[in-house]
Amino acid sequence: MSKELLHSIINREIVNEFGRKVGQVVDLVIDKKSGRILALVAKISKSEELLNKLTKDERGNIYIPMSVISITKNEFQIDEKKIRLIILKRKTTQKQES
């Protein structure tokens, strides 16, 4: 099992699949029961239209689910196709509830 200290994760870069920096980690969302990391809380550029459609906290940081993230030695890489699917599913659910 690979281990890493929290302070080495905070401020780590988040890049897209082409290696372009899209933001940085500012916090984590952890399941209290299992201890699993559920999402990264990230500070991103306002120009990141796709990522800005994800859930945000009161400071404008976004929650990126771990299901769309690959971890490399020095950064977190997001899969924008998976993010689009999450956003599409959320829109579909909202329409059905209306």
Residues of each region from the PLM?
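Peripheral interaction segments used for macromolecular assembly
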Residues: 1-98
